[in-house]
């Protein structure tokens, strides 16, 4: 699809390496990481994740998180970067959920601040579902601000507490949505003054997404 639009031809394509277990432990517990690496998930854990373990899933998961980190480092140098395999915001410290194995947003933000590449990071999450895993992993980190703009009556049922949560009613339209986006980004930037922004651009806000509930 990207080739059809012509965007692919104008892009510089990069390939990430796999994340190390030691690096991933900055955002996930080692026992869970090993379950993904070696296929040790229980049936109940696979049900919660929404995916059955396979070698390809494991390999992709270790690549995807580093894809976001690579993109972030490239964006710091060039001003912007795009990673199509990121945004896995339902993954928690010790388990995966909602088709999200590892939380690339939390992982990459923590790696950037740990290595002192940037000091303050804003995660601006516009997926139709709340970024509950991101919020919980980063809830005690004062250098990373989490903002989630999501449909109120949608997954997950039990919401987490982001630094800023904006809950949208069913059938929210373009004008209402853009108003909330503008108001929220202005508040986040003015109050937190981030050095770097992760933008999780979930496409499930589109009116043709059957489960999104927005217009």
Predicted regions and their residues:
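Charged, often glycine-rich, active-site loop that binds/positions anionic groups
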Residues: 17-41
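Residue-level detector of short coil/turn "hinge" positions at structural boundaries
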Residues: 9-10, 31, 119-120
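A general "terminal functional-core" signal
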Residues: 36, 43-215
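Short, conserved beta-strand segments within well-ordered enzyme catalytic domains
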Residues: 14, 25, 83
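N-terminal low-complexity, Ser/Thr- and acidic-residue-enriched intrinsically disordered segments
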Residues: 1-21
């Amino acid at each position: 699809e990207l080739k059809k639009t012509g965007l692919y031809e104008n892009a510089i394509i990069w390939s990430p390496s796999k994340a190390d277990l030691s690096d991933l432990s900055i955002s996930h517990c080692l026992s869970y990481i090993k379950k993904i690496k070696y296929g040790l998930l229980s049936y109940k854990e696979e049900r919660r994740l929404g995916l059955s373990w396979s070698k390809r899933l494991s390999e992709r998961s270790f690549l995807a998180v580093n894809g976001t980190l690579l993109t972030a480092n490239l964006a710091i140098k060039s001003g912007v970067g795009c990673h199509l395999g990121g945004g896995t915001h339902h993954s928690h410290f010790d388990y995966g959920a909602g088709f999200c194995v590892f939380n690339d947003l939390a992982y990459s933000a923590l790696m950037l601040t740990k290595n002192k590449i940037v000091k303050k990071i804003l995660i601006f999450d516009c997926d139709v579902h709340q970024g509950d895993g991101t919020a919980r992993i980063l809830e005690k980190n004062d250098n990373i601000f989490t903002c989630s703009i999501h449909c109120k009556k949608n997954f997950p049922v039990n919401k987490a507490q982001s630094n800023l949560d904006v809950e949208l009613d069913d059938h929210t339209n373009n004008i209402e949505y853009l108003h909330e986006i503008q108001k929220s980004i202005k508040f986040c930037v003015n109050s937190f003054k981030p050095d770097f922004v992760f933008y999780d651009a979930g496409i499930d806000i589109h009116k043709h997404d059957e489960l999104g509930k927005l217009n």
